[in-house]
A protein has these predicted regions:
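Short, active-site-adjacent cap segments at secondary-structure transitions
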Residues: 57-61, 66
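An acidic, glycine-rich surface segment that forms the CoA-thioester-binding/catalytic face
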Residues: 33-35, 39, 49, 65-97
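Conserved CoA-thioester-binding segment of acyl-CoA-metabolizing enzymes
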Residues: 1-55, 69-71
Length: 97
């Protein structure tokens, strides 16, 4: 199950953090899905701006500390071979707002 919802509304990408039971705290699967949402946004020439928001009355509680504490998830590499950002797209250079 993805915890990130991507919707295109005209030139706007609406990216929703959808893990309200954890106040949208980011764990590895959500970080990967969030990164993919921004890769998708960046690649689509019809989309001009992205709006990131949270479901369930919360924006984001930050990193899910239970998941981040797992030593097996530290020092992972992303698919391009660089360091994996714990929050998904935090280290991605984006050309669009």
């Amino acid at each position: 199950m993805s915890h990130v919802v991507f919707e295109a509304q005209g030139p706007v990408a609406l990216i929703t953090l959808d893990r309200p039971e954890r106040r949208n705290a980011v764990h590895r699967p959500m970080a990967d899905a969030l990164r993919e949402a921004f890769v998708r946004f960046e690649a689509d020439e019809a989309l001009r701006v992205a709006v990131l928001h949270g479901a369930g009355g919360h924006f984001c509680a930050g990193a899910d500390l239970t998941a981040v504490a797992d030593p097996l998830l530290r020092n992972e590499l992303d698919p391009e071979g660089g360091p994996r950002a714990p929050m998904g797209p935090t280290r991605m250079p984006l050309a669009k707002p």
